[in-house]
Amino acid sequence: MDPCECSKTGSCNCGGSCKCANCACTSCKKSCCPCCPSGCSKCASGCVCKGKTCDTSCCQ
């Protein structure tokens, strides 16, 4: 289960490894917050987010 409640509060901070604002990850090293838009399954977990769109540049 997602340790953050970004979808409910719009913001979160998970142990220094993940910081969200308006449910958009600015730093995502673990499956803490959704990096890509909902429905982008390839970015659902274990991602390092590079962008906010669901395409090949989204995750690395």
UniProtKB/Swiss-Prot annotation:
Binding-site residues, a divalent metal cation 7: 49, 54, 58-59
Domain of life: Eukaryota
Gene: mtb
Beta: annotated span: 1-28
Record flagged with keyword Isomerase: no
Protein family: Belongs to the metallothionein superfamily. Type 1 family.
Protein name: Metallothionein B
Residue spans crossing the bilayer: none
Binding annotation for a divalent metal cation 3: 14, 18, 23, 28
